[in-house]
Design a protein with these regions (language model features):
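C-terminal transmembrane helical hairpin of 12-TM major facilitator-type secondary transporters
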Residues: 311-357
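Juxtamembrane intracellular "pre-TM" segments in multi-pass secondary transporters
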Residues: 2-14, 216-251
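C-terminal ends and interior cores of transmembrane alpha-helices
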Residues: 96-118, 319-335
């Protein structure tokens, strides 16, 4: 249950915790941005260049779904393993090193293939993506998220989660503005881009060996327990659900918001480039939207701890829905009105999404049973990654293929993606209302 933060002095986190959380959190988000956006864009470009635009939707959908399955399964086992070991550091450090190596695998793939090689390349793209996800989920989803929960409490999670929720958009700026010039869909190969990106988590993993420290008092919470399978699936037990109902209500809300985001997220770059016709000029509006939403999210993060999260749930959810709908409405505007809706609507959309997810993540961490920070990361992944990354892309696939029937063989992400996303996000009002009512008690 959320406490009245006004009457509780926030526990200081310390400079080392802040630095490690932000630095390794950012590195993880840079790697995830490459997977969530560039791997999808890469696959879409490869098949568009090869004259198989229809494969763009199918491969993107399979990539997202199978990587979500890999991420969830990995986190379930790795989270429980880190709890039993009583350590997070080796999972983070060695996981980041392996993560970097797996990103470099994409350097082996060309940007255009012959008709006889299309299927093989599709399989390799999906396989490499799943291998990369295994590394990332072990180090980031399981170990790093458990490390954050270990080092925070309900008086300072709002600030830290607010900052952490900004990191994905900062990572987008770093990748697209700082490194995006290395990637070009017209290149024969984008090997240099994937090698450079892969070096970032690889080197960071080596640094983690010297900087990351496990929380004081962290011990092998289930050492001596022989029920390995039971510990692994702790978050899925009936008794765990009954004893921690609000944790699961929070996850349902996060699941709906995540599904809304996944409905359009993998196609966002090509939506700006192709659908809106911005071409290479998409970088400027994306940078403005990212920076603007980062400011919005940061402000909400500090306000959560100062005033309590309860009063912000509904306003931030409304922001999210309105922002998503604004992108759908862009098709009905021109000139200055179109640009204004793109920039303002984008900031409201991404700012709302990130701020709401930050609040829900903090509420989830508040609800974790003591000593089970690693074991519940798997069930968190099930609700925030697996389900959203199955349902969202399927919605995209249906709408995308339907649009191709209208536009011919061209690959043009449709505006209808945002209408569907807004509908899904609106349903989150039900679990959010329950969370808000419980927080008032």
């Amino acid at each position: 249950m959320e406490k009245n933060i006004n009457t509780v002095k926030a526990t200081p986190l310390g400079g080392k915790v802040w630095f490690n959380a932000i630095f390794f959190g950012l590195i993880g988000q840079i790697a995830w941005i490459v997977e969530n956006m560039y791997f999808a864009t890469f696959a879409q470009d490869v098949f568009a260049n090869s004259g198989r635009s229809d494969m763009s939707y199918w491969v993107t959908t399979l990539m997202v779904i199978l990587s979500a399955v890999a991420a969830t399964a990995t986190t379930i086992f790795a989270g429980a393993w880190s709890d039993r070991a009583g350590k997070r550091k080796p999972f983070i450090a060695f996981g980041y090193i392996f993560w970097g190596i797996t990103i470099m695998l994409f350097a082996l793939l060309p940007m255009k293939v012959s008709s006889g090689s299309v299927f093989m390349v599709a399989v390799l793209i999906i396989l490499f993506d799943c291998i990369m996800t295994f590394a990332g989920s072990t180090s980031n989803d399981a170990a790093f998220n458990a490390w954050v929960a270990d080092n925070t409490d309900d008086t300072n999670r709002g600030k830290l989660n607010g900052i952490l929720s900004i990191l994905p958009v900062i990572a987008v700026v770093i990748v697209f503005v700082g490194l995006g010039g290395l990637y070009n869909s017209a290149n024969e190969s984008n090997a240099l881009f994937f090698v450079v990106i892969g070096l970032i988590p690889l080197v960071s993993g080596i640094i983690a060996l010297f900087l990351i420290k496990d929380a004081k008092g962290l011990s092998a919470g289930t050492a001596g327990s022989r029920d390995t399978l039971g510990d692994t699936f702790y978050g899925f037990r009936r008794e765990t659900i009954r004893s921690n109902k609000m944790m699961y209500v929070t996850l349902i809300a996060a699941c709906l918001i995540g599904t809304a985001q996944q409905t359009f997220y993998s196609y966002l770059i090509n939506f700006l480039i192709i659908t809106l016709g911005l071409g290479d000029g998409f970088v400027i509006p994306m940078a403005v939207i990212i920076l603007g939403s980062a400011v919005v999210t940061g402000i909400f993060g500090f306000m959560y701890d100062k005033y309590g999260r309860r009063r912000f749930y509904f306003p931030v959810l409304l922001m999210t829905v309105i922002g998503i709908l604004s992108f759908y409405c862009i098709q009905y505007t021109e000139g200055t009105a179109r640009s204004l809706l793109l920039y303002v609507g984008g900031i409201v959309m991404m700012g709302g999404l990130l701020s709401l997810l930050a609040a829900l993540n903090a509420n989830f961490q508040d609800s974790i049973p003591s000593g089970s920070e690693g074991r519940v990361q798997g069930v968190r992944m099930c609700f925030t990654v697996l389900i959203p990354m199955i349902i969202g892309p399927i919605i995209s696939l249906i709408l995308g293929l339907d649009a191709m029937g209208i536009n011919g063989s061209d690959f043009v992400p449709p505006f209808s993606l945002y209408a569907a996303a807004a509908i899904v996000a609106s349903i989150a009002v039900i679990p959010v209302a329950v969370i808000r009512r419980r927080a008032a008690r």
